[in-house]
Amino acid sequence: MNSERAQIANPPTQTPVPQQQEIPLAMVHGQPVLQIPQDLYIPPDALEVILDAFEGPLDLLLYLIRRQNLNILDIPVAEITRQYVDYINVMQELRFELAAEYLVMAAILAEIKSRMLLPRPPDIENEEGEDPRAELVRRLQEYERFKQAAEDLDALPRMDRDNSAAHAFVPDQTTVRIPPPVNMKELLLALQDVLKRAELFSGHAIRREALSVRQRMGDILAHLEGGKFHPFTALFTAEEGKLGVLVTFLAILELAKEQLLDIVQEASLGPIYIKSLATHHTNGALQLSSDFDNSPSTHVPP
């Protein structure tokens, strides 16, 4: 009896159930602000800045759940609904049209809360029925997957945001390839080849025709009109014999000395090409002269 009276006099203390921590509206000087001060002035457009952080009702609901590290599969509907409605009330006070789409989610939360509070019929009390939160959990999980995928895509480098294309003006430049100069040894080898071919031709000369180096210089310039390269061997006529070949060769040397010819060779022992430079030096008649002739100078028309 004494022990029973002691128990009645000193009833056992019950362990208090920990309450869920309320999310503060803001932190001021390190102190949480749970309610909006009555004398706080909020500009009419301030809510637009707040709502920019949320992309819809599901985003706000997911924020409330993740903020408190709650299990999305076991949502405390009563507390989440209360916090959600608090946000809706703030929205309605400032800008009702912005909070309209959030009212639908508030109604869904209220319905789920009421379904969980209503007693179940005795006949299905022992049966495992569908959780009223199942559809909401499914929508939240699906939304979270899409949101994570969008954040992953946004983290990828983007042109004109993370990278900039480099633009540089490159002037149009035409590459002029200057052929290498011809070695005198190569030129003599080419002359030797022409002389060998001239020996293959034989004829009966009735009288010797005087060959002029100056005249041959004019013939060569006339043959090279147009400024194009011609083969070295194309300037020689084998039928003229060795004398004609030598006169042509001397005329080429005289023109090269006067810088009226451009003689090039692509590679060693390769073919030799000649181009006239007369049009680059003068637009009038050329005065040609040679130390090998005693006759008057030859004039070449332009």
Swiss-Prot record:
<dbReference type="Pfam" id="PF02616">
    <property type="entry name" value="SMC_ScpA"/>
</dbReference>
<dbReference type="GO" id="GO:0006260">
    <property type="term" value="P:DNA replication"/>
</dbReference>
<keyword id="KW-0131">Cell cycle</keyword>
<comment type="function">
    <text>Participates in chromosomal partition during cell division. May act via the formation of a condensin-like complex containing Smc and ScpB that pull DNA away from mid-cell into both cell halves.</text>
</comment>
<keyword id="KW-0159">Chromosome partition</keyword>
<dbReference type="GO" id="GO:0005737">
    <property type="term" value="C:cytoplasm"/>
</dbReference>
<keyword id="KW-0963">Cytoplasm</keyword>
<protein>
    <recommendedName>
        <fullName>Segregation and condensation protein A</fullName>
    </recommendedName>
</protein>
<dbReference type="GO" id="GO:0007059">
    <property type="term" value="P:chromosome segregation"/>
</dbReference>
<keyword id="KW-0132">Cell division</keyword>
<dbReference type="GO" id="GO:0051301">
    <property type="term" value="P:cell division"/>
</dbReference>
<dbReference type="InterPro" id="IPR003768">
    <property type="entry name" value="ScpA"/>
</dbReference>
<comment type="similarity">
    <text>Belongs to the ScpA family.</text>
</comment>
<dbReference type="InterPro" id="IPR023093">
    <property type="entry name" value="ScpA-like_C"/>
</dbReference>
<comment type="subunit">
    <text>Component of a cohesin-like complex composed of ScpA, ScpB and the Smc homodimer, in which ScpA and ScpB bind to the head domain of Smc. The presence of the three proteins is required for the association of the complex with DNA.</text>
</comment>
